[in-house]
């Protein structure tokens, strides 16, 4: 059998294995504990099988397309189920399966007391299937099905603890912001079906239509909603109300990458459209700076990591904006490892400290939780781009390529400022959570000696150290960037990172025991997330409701209910009363006048 035939066969085999636990729940009751282990084993087997087509592709460099089920025909439009197995899909699928395997094993420890843990695992598996459909889709309809699938599963998993009002509000907020982005996606689908009469990627890219600014703007809007870019970003920090495994899987390594992945998928249309490239660059630059500023003063450990995720997503958008989609994809893959590990480590701390998420109430955990502390330190160093960790192999080329770029200097400048802030908020987590004296109640028993907790974190530690090298070595850039930066400037990047660590540590030491009488405006701006939630979720609805109430009061009450009926009726009654009041009741005078008129008439006739 040829290599090209093995790739689709093994890929579909891994997808079929993932559907087996779902099928099992339809045939029999899934309330037994064995369902959890069957689901985890299915994901593990699918991961092992998915490695084979990935390695075969890297060896042969032959893409594969599967189109084996014709769905329906509408006039001249043929809709079919088709998969595109290229570098992007075959590289991302094993990464998604590996991270899901680790997070499911972590969930056996984190969610062990939840009475509905079987349903939780089923939701995670359904999300994974829809995510794999999204990355392997070969047409817009199938891509949209995966796109909506991950959105629905995100809604269900954020609101998992539906007894909490904040969780329900966060899930609804995520759904509404993503619906705004879906408007752009539907507009893009409508444009392509009107102008090209096809949703197949090959036909769209081969036709290469002109004036694609409108559909690509719709795609950018959709990606901004799904990947939490500026303007549509507030849902991502709020989504931390869900369980930590949900944050680790959906909101750091897979679902939020869907918007960036879709932009990477459409790079053949974007590479010649300077308007879209500039818009993507500026949007990503604003996002990465804004969310980095907001992360500097947050005290919730999960929100700090969530805002750093949004900042890294902005960095990926910047990379796409400077026409380096393969570099953005490399950063997307490497980022998944250490960000999932950071979330699992924070979940370990939160669970051991009785659901405490404030980093000011932690401290001294490097003694009681050494493995978790090691994971947080390695993840933070990888996030800052420390040499020879996973993040270095993608973040350093992005910075170098951006510095050598000659377009939109202000966007590149604020991107570099945002990248330098990464070391500050990473050091802040390490300083407050791991160092110093314990600030949590002494009665809390901290224990991380559980294989379901330690093993996933250990696997992700290995991925955060070694996978960046392997991914970067097998990624061929679409356009070769001009690497003309002098060596001393390259060392300056490392020096700036170390300087950020040093400054953040000194500031934390200096201000640790100080109390601020009145925070500065910049501190308040960062703490309140740039006043964005207050403006969009409080002030604008308040103004809208106030205006609606005033209009309703003025039109309904003052005009209709008051003027039209009571006052108008009173006016009519006054008019009738004035007419009636002219009758004085002087009967003798009336009869005398009547008699005089008759007499005068008779005299005239005579």
From Swiss-Prot:
Cellular localization per UniProt: Mitochondrion inner membrane
Keyword Lyase: no
Disulphide linkage map: none
One example of a Gene Ontology biological process annotation: mitochondrial electron transport, NADH to ubiquinone
Gene Ontology molecular-function annotations: NADH dehydrogenase (ubiquinone) activity
Keywords in alphabetical order: Electron transport, Membrane, Mitochondrion, Mitochondrion inner membrane, NAD, Respiratory chain, Translocase, Transmembrane, Transmembrane helix, Transport, Ubiquinone
Taxonomy, superkingdom: Eukaryota
Its job: Core subunit of the mitochondrial membrane respiratory chain NADH dehydrogenase (Complex I) which catalyzes electron transfer from NADH through the respiratory chain, using ubiquinone as an electron acceptor. Essential for the catalytic activity and assembly of complex I.
Subunit details: Core subunit of respiratory chain NADH dehydrogenase (Complex I) which is composed of 45 different subunits.
Protein name (database record): NADH-ubiquinone oxidoreductase chain 5
Organism per entry: Elephas maximus
Gene transcribed to yield this protein: MT-ND5
């Amino acid at each position: 059998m040829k290599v090209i035939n093995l790739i689709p066969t093994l890929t579909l085999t891994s997808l079929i294995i993932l559907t087996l636990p779902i099928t099992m729940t339809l045939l029999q009751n899934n309330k037994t504990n064995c369902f959890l282990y069957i689901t985890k084993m299915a994901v593990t087997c699918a991961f092992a099988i998915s490695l084979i087509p990935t390695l075969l592709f890297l060896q042969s460099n032959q893409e594969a397309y599967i189109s084996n089920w014709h769905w329906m025909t509408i006039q001249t439009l043929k809709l079919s189920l088709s998969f595109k197995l290229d570098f992007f899909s075959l590289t991302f699928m094993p990464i998604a399966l590996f991270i899901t395997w680790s997070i499911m094993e972590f969930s056996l420890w984190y969610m062990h007391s939840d009475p509905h843990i079987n349903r939780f695992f089923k939701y995670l598996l359904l999300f994974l299937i829809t995510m794999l459909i999204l990355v392997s889709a070969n047409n817009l309809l199938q891509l949209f099905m995966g796109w909506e699938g991950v959105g629905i599963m995100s809604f269900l998993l954020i609101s998992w603890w539906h007894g909490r009002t904040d969780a329900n509000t966060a899930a609804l907020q995520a759904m509404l912001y993503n619906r705004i982005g879906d408007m752009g996606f539907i507009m893009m689908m409508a444009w392509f079906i009107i102008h090209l009469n096809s949703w197949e990627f090959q036909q769209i890219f081969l036709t290469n239509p002109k004036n694609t600014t409108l559909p690509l703007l719709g795609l950018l809007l959709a990606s901004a909603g799904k990947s939490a870019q500026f303007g549509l970003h507030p849902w991502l920090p709020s989504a931390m109300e869900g369980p930590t495994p949900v944050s680790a899987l959906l909101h750091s390594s897979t679902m939020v990458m869907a918007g960036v992945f879709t932009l990477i998928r459409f790079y053949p249309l974007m590479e010649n459209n300077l308007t879209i490239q500039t818009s993507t660059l500026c949007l990503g630059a604003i996002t990465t700076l804004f969310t980095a500023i907001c992360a500097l003063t947050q005290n919730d450990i999960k929100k700090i990591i969530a805002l750093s995720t949004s900042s890294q997503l902005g960095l990926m958008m910047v990379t796409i904006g400077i026409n380096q989609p393969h570099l953005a994809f490399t950063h997307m893959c490497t980022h998944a490892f250490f960000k999932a590990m950071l979330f699992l480590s924070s979940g370990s701390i939160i669970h051991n400290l009785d659901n405490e998420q404030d980093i000011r109430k932690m401290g001294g955990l490097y003694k009681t939780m050494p493995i978790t502390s090691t994971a947080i330190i390695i993840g933070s160093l990888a996030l800052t781009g420390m040499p020879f960790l996973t993040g270095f192999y993608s973040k350093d080329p992005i910075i170098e390529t951006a510095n050598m770029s000659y377009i939109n200097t202000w966007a590149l400048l604020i991107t570099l400022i945002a990248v330098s802030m990464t070391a500050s908020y990473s050091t802040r987590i390490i300083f407050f959570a791991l160092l110093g004296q314990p600030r949590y109640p002494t009665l809390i028993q901290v224990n991380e000696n559980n294989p379901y907790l330690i093993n996933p974190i250990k696997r992700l530690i290995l991925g955060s150290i070694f996978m960046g090298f392997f991914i970067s070595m097998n990624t061929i850039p679409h356009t070769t960037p001009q690497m003309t930066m002098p060596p001393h400037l390259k060392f300056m990047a490392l020096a700036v990172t170390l300087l950020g660590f040093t400054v953040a540590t000194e500031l934390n030491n200096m201000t640790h025991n100080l109390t601020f009488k009145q925070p500065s405006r910049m501190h308040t701006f960062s703490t309140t997330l740039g006043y964005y939630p207050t403006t969009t979720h409080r002030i604008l609805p308040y103004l809208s409701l106030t205006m609606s109430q005033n209009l309703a009061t003025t039109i309904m009450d003052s005009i209709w209910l008051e003027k039209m009926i009571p006052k108008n009726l009173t006016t009519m009654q006054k008019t009738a009363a004035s007419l009636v009041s002219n009758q004085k009741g002087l009967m003798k005078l009336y009869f005398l006048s009547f008699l005089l008129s008759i007499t005068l008439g008779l005299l005239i006739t005579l």
